[in-house]
Each structure stands twice: as C-alpha cells, then as structure tokens.
C-alpha cells in the first residue's frame, strides 16, 4: 500500500507543479487545482481505510464538498473574467488595483 500512497502523493506534486507552470490561463490553473483536490481526496480516503479510524470517516466527504464549492466559485470567476476581458489570462487580473 505504500507504493499506492506514494503514487498519489506524486500526483499531488505534479498537479502543484502544473499550477506553478501553467499559471498564465485561469482554466489551466483550475484544472490543476481540481487534480490536487482529487488526489487529496483519494489519499485521505485510503489513509482512513488503512488506519480504521471511524471518527474521521466524514473527512473525505467534507473535502469533496469544499472541492465542489471551489470548482463552482472558480467557474463563476472564469465566466465573469472571460465576459469582462474577452480572455482568461491571469495577467489581466490585478486585484490590488482600486
């Protein structure tokens, strides 16, 4: 089981590297964030099932709820940005500007 956990951790690291490399487009960043959340969900589920901790059995479901909320907010932001600016480049966003 250690090799499965290692592969899932590597998938998380690869998705994190994708966020750092493909940060020019918002859609690419959102896809990499979803990959990170999916690998975290699988890792938490496997760790809970391996350790037989019944008190934390709701944690994967809570993680899925937060992942769905993150996806919804991200897609709403993507639609708003693409209708306002005409593209999804992250360079157009300057959130510190008044």
Curated annotation (Swiss-Prot):
Keywords: Electron transport, Membrane, Mitochondrion, Mitochondrion inner membrane, NAD, Respiratory chain, Translocase, Transmembrane, Transmembrane helix, Transport, Ubiquinone. GO terms for biological process: ATP synthesis coupled electron transport. Its EC number is 7.1.1.2. It is found in: Mitochondrion inner membrane. It comes from the Eukaryota. The chain crosses the membrane at residues 1-21, 28-48, 61-81. GO terms for molecular function: NADH dehydrogenase (ubiquinone) activity. It is an enzyme of class 7 (translocase). GO terms for cellular component: mitochondrial inner membrane; respiratory chain complex I. The keyword Translocase applies. The keyword Cell division does not apply. It catalyses: a ubiquinone + NADH + 5 H(+)(in) = a ubiquinol + NAD(+) + 4 H(+)(out). Pfam families: Oxidored_q2. It is a multi-pass membrane protein. Belongs to the complex I subunit 4L family. Core subunit of the mitochondrial membrane respiratory chain NADH dehydrogenase (Complex I) which catalyzes electron transfer from NADH through the respiratory chain, using ubiquinone as an electron acceptor. Part of the enzyme membrane arm which is embedded in the lipid bilayer and involved in proton translocation. Core subunit of respiratory chain NADH dehydrogenase (Complex I) which is composed of 45 different subunits. This is NADH-ubiquinone oxidoreductase chain 4L. It comes from Thylamys elegans (Elegant fat-tailed mouse opossum). The gene is MT-ND4L.
